[in-house]
């Protein structure tokens, strides 16, 4: 930053005709790309979703470790990613997931002194656990035309990171959804 004022001063001294000009005509051409969509997280038959803009929370009620270990419905919650205000310039929406992972596809518990051996996975609704999205990966999923109109139905699930290794306690994890458009 210190070189910028010095350089500007030298240019002004070296080009006195430009420095004393009274009129300056500038032709500026810009290409405006289409704006992106507004993406929100909404309830969809599961616990309440709180928050707005870029910070949402979904709270799964207290659940027994036996439910987590057996992948019972009580150890998961449904929600939707909903797109609105999308530009007509986009025909495709792609989503990737980021977060601190443990055990490949599960996001680690960030609660201090919390549950051990338990992670959080996110997948499309009504699919097997083997389809959990892989965080921090180039894998992405594309929204269908119906999903662009009505939202992408997803499930967040608590699962043991290693069978039989789960321990009870508080659980809190953060996942970030990233969107690209074509």
For every predicted segment, state its role:
Residues 1-20:
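Gram-negative bacterial Sec-dependent N-terminal signal peptides
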Residues 2-3, 20-182:
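Mature extracellular/passenger domains of Gram-negative fimbrial/pilin and adhesin proteins
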């Amino acid at each position: 930053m210190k070189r910028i004022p010095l350089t500007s001063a030298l240019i002004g001294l070296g080009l006195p005709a430009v420095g004393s000009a009274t009129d300056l005509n500038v032709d500026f051409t810009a290409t405006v790309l289409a704006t992106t969509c507004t993406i929100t997280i909404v309830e969809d038959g599961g616990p309440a979703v709180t928050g707005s803009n870029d910070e949402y929370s979904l709270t799964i009620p207290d659940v027994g470790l036996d439910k987590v270990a057996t992948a019972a419905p009580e150890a998961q919650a449904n929600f939707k990613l909903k797109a609105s205000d999308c530009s007509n310039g986009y025909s495709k929406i792609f989503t990737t997931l980021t977060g601190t992972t443990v055990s490949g596809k599960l996001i680690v518990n960030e609660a201090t002194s919390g549950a051990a051996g338990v992670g959080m996975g996110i997948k499309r609704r009504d699919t097997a656990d083997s389809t959990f999205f892989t965080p921090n990966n180039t894998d992405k999923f594309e929204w269908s035309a119906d999903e662009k109109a009505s939202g992408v139905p997803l499930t967040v699930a608590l699962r043991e990171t290693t069978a039989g290794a789960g321990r009870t306690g508080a659980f809190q994890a953060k996942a970030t959804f990233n969107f690209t458009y074509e």
